[in-house]
Regions:
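Domain-level signal for Mg2+-assisted phosphodiester chemistry and nucleotide/NA-binding surfaces
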Residues: 1-92, 105, 134-136
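Nuclease catalytic cores that cleave nucleic-acid phosphodiester bonds
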Residues: 57-165
Length: 165
């Protein structure tokens, strides 16, 4: 945690699958979590940082999750479920929602930062702003972030090439 003048006490929530696929589909590159962390720490105190990912028995995934932990994220994993019809399931929306609501209720946190383009979170952001008065910031890939989510946030930051590896 950063010492000195703190502009915001923030909680960061990363929908890892959403960020992975939207940056890959738009830029064919990966998101730079370390750079994001540095940018956020320059202007705030990170009280909580959760990254929500899918647990797969893959060496690259294990290295990635270890890197996230090294940066400072709590990595929350859910099993990867392959259905008989070939589709896959690994949705963290409810888990993210529960954790965001708990953080918003925490008097030590005044800003919620969400990395996702998923429009399902728009109601969540509207609710926590109305109920707890927290500031909400969304990071998402342009054209792949739901307008309803952008409109629900106090601030929207486009994930551009400068935030990629």
């Amino acid at each position: 945690m950063k010492k000195g003048t703190i502009l915001q006490n923030i909680a960061v929530f990363v929908d890892v699958q959403n960020i992975y696929y939207t940056t890959r589909d738009t830029y064919q590159r990966q998101f730079n979590y370390r750079l994001l962390w540095q940018e956020l720490m320059a202007q705030s105190d990170i009280v909580l940082a959760n990254a929500y990912a899918i647990q797969r028995s893959d060496d690259q995934q294990h290295k990635f999750q270890k890197a996230l932990k090294h940066i400072g994220f709590n990595v929350k994993l859910k099993p990867y479920i392959q259905r008989s019809d070939g589709s896959a399931k690994g949705d963290w929306d409810v888990g993210i929602t529960i954790d965001v609501m708990a953080a918003a209720a925490n008097k030590n946190i005044n800003t919620i930062v969400l990395l996702s383009g998923d429009g399902d979170f728009d109601l969540l952001l509207r609710h926590i702003k109305a109920e707890y008065g927290v500031k909400t910031i969304v990071y998402g890939v342009p054209n792949l972030t739901a307008n309803s989510l952008i409109n629900a946030a106090d601030e929207y930051h486009e994930i551009l090439q400068s935030l990629l590896l």
